C-alpha cells in the first residue's frame, strides 16, 4: 500500500478517535475511541518503519508494545467502568466525579 493511502487512513482514524474522545460522554465509547487512536498510531509506526529501513524492525516491535498496552487497557478499562457503574449507577463521564463522595 502506498504511503499516502496509509497516512490518509491513519489520519482519518486518528481524527475519528479524537472527535469521539472530545464529544463522548460515555466511558465505554471513550475507551473505544482511544483504541482507534492507538491503532492509527500503530499504522504510522509500521509504515514509516517499512519506508525508512525495512531491515530493522524498530517500528514493528514498538507497535507490538503499543498493542500489548492497548490489550491491557482493554482488559482493565471495562472492569473500572463496571466498578464505577456499580457504585455510581452511571457511566457518563461528566457525572462521575470520583473525588467527591
From Swiss-Prot:
The chain crosses the membrane at residues 2-22, 27-46, 61-81. It is found in: Plastid, Chloroplast thylakoid membrane. It comes from the Eukaryota. It is an enzyme of class 7 (translocase). Its EC number is 7.1.1.-. It catalyses: a plastoquinone + NADH + (n+1) H(+)(in) = a plastoquinol + NAD(+) + n H(+)(out); a plastoquinone + NADPH + (n+1) H(+)(in) = a plastoquinol + NADP(+) + n H(+)(out). The keyword Nucleus does not apply. Keywords: Chloroplast, Membrane, NAD, NADP, Plastid, Plastoquinone, Quinone, Thylakoid, Translocase, Transmembrane, Transmembrane helix, Transport. The keyword Transmembrane helix applies. It is a multi-pass membrane protein. One of its GO terms (cellular component) is NADH dehydrogenase complex. GO terms for biological process: ATP synthesis coupled electron transport; photosynthesis, light reaction. GO terms for molecular function: oxidoreductase activity, acting on NAD(P)H, quinone or similar compound as acceptor; quinone binding. NDH shuttles electrons from NAD(P)H:plastoquinone, via FMN and iron-sulfur (Fe-S) centers, to quinones in the photosynthetic chain and possibly in a chloroplast respiratory chain. The immediate electron acceptor for the enzyme in this species is believed to be plastoquinone. Couples the redox reaction to proton translocation, and thus conserves the redox energy in a proton gradient. Belongs to the complex I subunit 4L family. PANTHER family: NADH-UBIQUINONE OXIDOREDUCTASE CHAIN 4L (PTHR11434:SF16), NADH-UBIQUINONE OXIDOREDUCTASE SUBUNIT ND4L (PTHR11434). NDH is composed of at least 16 different subunits, 5 of which are encoded in the nucleus. This is NAD(P)H-quinone oxidoreductase subunit 4L, chloroplastic.
